[in-house]
From Swiss-Prot:
Leader sequence segment: 1-26
One Gene Ontology MF term: toxin activity
One Pfam family in the UniProt entry: Pilosulin
Gene Ontology CC annotation, any one: extracellular region
Protein name: U10-myrmicitoxin-Mri1b
Known function: Induces paralysis after injection into blowflies (L.caesar), and then death within 24 hours. May have antimicrobial properties, like most ant linear peptides.
Chief location bin: secreted
Organism this protein belongs to: Manica rubida (European giant red ant)
Tissues of expression: Expressed by the venom gland.
Keyword Secreted: yes
InterPro entries with a match to the protein in the record: Pilosulin
Length: 81
């Protein structure tokens, strides 16, 4: 019979934790809105495929890797072939 009290106790603790949780408030910065709008306008003008697929994504990652860390890219090229 005591095991039923454990679940009731845990449920009460869970409800109390939710009720007494601190409230959070999102703060909007006008600079962030301006940047997001500029990015959205720039992306709206771009023409391309919405989902380029894994091959194009890997090609972009490989290009960035070769530009940023050429020694690692060379090591990977030697191992892969």
């Amino acid at each position: 019979m005591r095991l039923s009290y454990i679940s009731l106790t845990l449920a009460i603790i869970f409800v109390m934790a939710i009720v007494h949780a601190p409230e959070t408030e999102a703060k909007a910065y006008p600079e962030a809105d301006a940047v997001a709008e500029a990015i959205a306008v720039g992306e709206a003008d771009a023409v391309g495929v919405a989902d380029p697929g894994i091959k194009d994504a890997l090609a972009k990652i490989w290009k960035i890797l070769k530009a940023e860390v050429p020694t690692v890219a060379a090591a990977i090229e030697n191992k892969v072939g």
